Curated annotation (Swiss-Prot):
InterPro entries: Aromatic_Lyase, Fumarase/histidase_N, L-Aspartase-like, Phe/His_NH3-lyase_AS, Phe_NH3-lyase, Phe_NH3-lyase_shielding_dom_sf. The active site is at Y100. This is Phenylalanine ammonia-lyase. This is a key enzyme of plant metabolism catalyzing the first reaction in the biosynthesis from L-phenylalanine of a wide variety of natural products based on the phenylpropane skeleton. Gene3D superfamilies: Fumarase/aspartase (Central domain), Fumarase/aspartase (N-terminal domain), Phenylalanine ammonia-lyase 1, domain 3. CDD domains: PAL-HAL. One of its GO terms (cellular component) is cytoplasm. Belongs to the PAL/histidase family.
Length: 708
């Protein structure tokens, strides 16, 4: 990440190429979104994070939030630059220069003056310690420790750049706290991210200065006082007595909002890729038509997010067994389903593409923010002046988080629409209602409860999509009359990510159930087909005297009925006269009998006379064969293996079934849907889903299939 320039080198700012940074912003979006997510994952797993003031990315703050292995790094120029701004503050005060936050009050009361710079910084930290933790109430009002650690990292990164007037020793102390996994306790609420995240950051400053109300949490979750935290972290020399401007440098920045935003966006990017792959699996289990991914369609629309989403789905579906089987099905009976798939499938690239673009743009915006110098005033040593501006305004955070949250809600809406089709036997092309897998559908209601839960998740997610940034209130005696609400928006986006994880986990469980049901369907249909074929040969081929019988010509049409009839429409009682299979098999024989003409008058050539024998033998044999096929699957010896192994989506299925140890849900077993969904959700939260997700796409070359 380029952007910050060394203090004291003004010529570096007078650049003629890309002076407005638009080119740099555009360059950051080169390459595929998937490649960027892969880089995020690689950097997340990097055992060390180097802090240099300009090189932090939104891909690299999540690791330090979760681990205790950050390491500091700085170029030879950084300490000199940093100390020069610190010296400049002291010299200007000693020379009687009037500087905001050094000799003046703060905000709307900056008309006040003092020469006691040390006491002023001490008072700043005291009055900003305005947060509520709710100790003893049973409810936590403490910022998640991961977000606090991300904030510490981002604040160090900002202050390293040398425009804030703070000593290196203070930054070194914060780094030691990070490296020893010691986390200050910050209030969850109380910041508007306008003059930065003043209130929460003041608690980090409070720990550094040894305020008696400051608390921290140790590596094992133990509560620590400031003194215990310093001792455990190996910070020498006791608590810091802040010099002029140092308190302001610590609290006047956007680190809490941007730190949390970077964590949120890491997960949002992964969930975006997951939604693309889940949409492709949806096409597989729904017998969809893969032409919706054809590159020409999307190239003509021009949007890169859409083009990439379609290309990823196209890659998953390419050579998929399910797509080959669906193509044969559509060719055999083109009227069995609509000519075009419904929008939740057919327009999924068009729907997901803009959401991916929004999330990617937000990621870059936050990346720029966490590398920015965002306090006030800024010390320009080269021009011997303090610049009073507003880089502490966290609008990039509020806007990017609002936009990301809306994108996440849209992804969730698509997932819900697809899920609703999947569990509905009017739309799911032959799967059972509620994805029930038991023998008796009257005692197995499958995913009915799950669908209710999904509606709840989706409703909450849609509510969370409402913007935060349009609820600004004027604050601090109308000095902070517009404010970004960046951390609030980041917190709400973190909630949205959690809800989308619930939806994605639940949906993945449902898709795995559908895959197993397609496997069961194929084996049951194979058993029915073989049985009908054998019974037809035994009862319809020969007459009573051993001669060839006219009914032998019914066999092909009987098998066509089996091929076209949804097996789960009759599987619980395959010989029931109330179910379509037996009705249509009988109708085939009746139709042939009506065409048999004068031969029907002869008992030895009558097809009508054969119907009873055919049905009686089928009733005697078919239920046993259907049960045998089902039992073979349950015992691990199916006649036909699960075709998912022939698909690029197999790694996700394998992860859910083998690594997590789950199986097809049925009312015949005690395991509830929630137990399985909980397992998958935990794996998603732990990052376990990432490797199988990327495994599905490991052979994708980053381009759509050629159209010519």
């Amino acid at each position: 990440m380029e952007g910050a320039i060394a203090n004291g080198h003004t010529n570096d700012f007078c650049i003629k190429v890309d002076p407005l940074n638009w080119e740099m912003a555009a360059d950051s979006l080169k390459g595929s979104h998937l490649d960027e997510v892969k880089r995020m994952v690689a950097e997340f797993r990097n055992p060390a994070v180097k802090i240099g003031g300009q090189t932090l990315t939104s891909l690299r703050s999540p690791p330090i939030a979760a681990r205790d292995n950050a390491s500091k790094w700085s170029s030879p120029r950084l300490p000199a630059r940093r100390e020069s701004s610190s010296d400049w503050v002291m010299n200007s005060m000693n020379n009687g220069t009037d500087s905001y936050g050094v000799t003046t009050g703060f905000g709307a009361t900056s008309h006040r003056r003092t020469k006691n710079g040390h006491a002023l910084q001490q008072e700043l930290i005291r009055f900003l310690n305005a947060g509520i933790f709710g100790t003893g109430t049973g409810a936590s009002h403490t910022l998640p420790h991961s977000a606090t650690r991300a904030a510490m990292l981002v604040r160090i990164n900002t202050l390293l750049q040398g425009y804030s007037g703070i000593r290196f020793e203070i930054l070194e102390a914060i780094t030691k706290l990070l490296n020893h996994n010691i986390t200050p306790c910050l209030p969850l609420r109380g910041t508007i991210t306008a003059s930065g995240d003043l209130v929460p950051l003041s608690y980090i400053a409070g720990l550094l200065t040894g305020r008696p109300n400051s608390k921290a949490v140790g590596p094992n979750g133990e509560a620590l006082t400031a003194e215990e935290a310093f001792k455990l972290a190996g910070v020498q020399g006791g608590f810091f007595e802040l010099q002029p401007k140092e308190g302001l440098a610590l609290v006047n920045g956007t680190a809490v909002g941007s730190g949390m935003a970077s964590m949120v966006l890491f997960e949002a990017n992964v969930l975006a890729v997951l939604s693309e792959v889940l949409s492709a699996i949806f096409a597989e289990v729904m017998n969809g038509k893969p032409e919706f991914t054809d590159h020409l369609t999307h190239k003509l629309k021009h949007h890169p997010g859409q083009i990439e989403a379609a290309a990823i789905m196209e890659h998953i579906l390419d050579r998929s067994y399910y797509m080959k089987a669906a193509q044969k099905l559509h060719e055999m009976d083109p009227l069995q389903k609509p000519k075009q798939d419904r929008y939740a499938l057919r327009t999924s690239p068009q729907w997901l593409g803009p959401q991916i673009e929004v999330i990617r743009q937000a990621t870059k915006m936050i990346e720029r923010e966490i590398n920015s110098v965002n306090d006030n005033p800024l010390i320009d040593v080269s021009r011997n002046k303090a610049l009073h501006g507003g880089n502490f305004q966290g609008t990039p955070i509020g806007v990017s988080m609002d936009n990301s949250r809306l994108a996440l809600a849209s992804i969730g809406k698509l997932i819900f629409a697809q899920f609703s089709e999947l569990v509905n036997d009017y739309y799911n092309n032959g799967l059972p209602s509620n994805l029930t897998a038991g023998r008796n559908p009257s005692l197995d209601y499958g995913f009915k409860g799950v669908e209710i839960a999904m509606a709840s998740y989706c409703s909450e997610l849609q509510f969370l999509a409402n913007p935060v940034t349009n609820h600004v209130q004027s604050a601090e005696q109308h000095n902070q009359d517009v404010n970004s609400l960046g951390l609030i928006s980041a917190r709400k986006t973190a909630e949205a990510v959690d809800v989308l994880k619930l939806m994605s986990s639940t949906y993945l469980v449902a898709l795995c159930q559908a895959i197993d049901l397609r496997h069961l369907e194929e084996n049951l249909k194979n058993a029915v087909r073989n049985t009908v074929n054998q019974v037809a040969k035994r009862t319809l081929t020969m007459g009573v005297n051993g001669e060839l019988h006219p009914s032998r010509f019914c066999e092909k049409d009987l098998l066509r009925v089996v091929d076209r009839e949804y097996v789960f429409a009759y599987a619980d009682d395959p010989c029931s006269a109330n179910y379509p299979l037996f009705q249509k098999l009988r109708q085939v024989l009746v139709d042939h009998a009506l065409q048999n003409g004068e031969h029907e008058k002869n008992v030895s050539t009558s097809i009508f006379q054969k119907i009873a024998a055919f049905e009686d033998e089928l009733k005697a044999v078919l239920p046993k064969e259907v049960e045998g096929a089902r039992s073979a699957i349950e015992n691990g010896n199916p006649a036909i293996p699960n075709r998912i192994t022939e698909c690029r989506s197999y790694p996700l299925y394998k992860f859910v079934r083998e690594e997590l140890g789950t199986e097809m849900l049925t009312g015949e077993k005690v395991k509830s849907p929630g137990e399985v969904c909980d397992k998958v959700f935990t794996a998603v939260c732990d990052g376990g889903i990432i490797d199988p997700l990327l495994e599905c796409l490991k052979s994708w070359d980053g381009a759509p299939l050629p159209i010519c």
